[in-house]
Amino acid sequence: LQLTGAGVLTAVIDSGIDYTHRDFRNPDGTTRIHALWDQTAQGMPPEGYDRGALYTKEDINKALAAETAEERKRIVPIEDRNGHGTAVAGIMAGNGSSSGGVNRGVAPGSELLVVKMGMTNERGFPRTTELMLGLDFVIREAIRAGKPVAVNVSFGNSYGAHDGTSLLESYIDTVSQIWKNNIIIAAGNDAVSAGHFRAVMI
């Protein structure tokens, strides 16, 4: 099957993205990123939201065409400081341009939709509210674009009931029924850390 993800949005809700990376650009050098919402930035947030800054495809292309790194950073100042979001985006949708087509992602023909989640500090994790806002944004944006969306959530914490009853779990279950979307949640990131225990209270 020649499935490339063409006509589909690939959403990455994570630590950001290196939007200058060649794997996220078209052969002519323009961006493959449909939109980028940085929840941590000061600027013009997406319509209906009260935080962060939204960068459109046009903004990103303008930044990519800038003559200096300083000018590029002034136009679209987003950074992915720990690289997690960039790595995830590459696995999902990298087109392999930086490796001569060898290392391509699962959907190299898709457009990217990126949310850099807000965090209380650089070494912390986003709150569940940031994740919920990110999910809301990418699904609304997919509806506006008229395209199905595959959403990856693999950056965050392991809080919650883990039985489907928490607010976040209920929210994900609800929004998964809206529009044409698939929400993929990482599991097992804590490995053998034994962060959860089962017990009977007497």
Show where each model-derived region lies:
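Subtilisin-like serine protease catalytic core
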Residues: 2-129, 146-148, 164, 179-180, ...
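Substrate-binding/access-modulating region of protease and related hydrolase catalytic domains
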Residues: 119-201
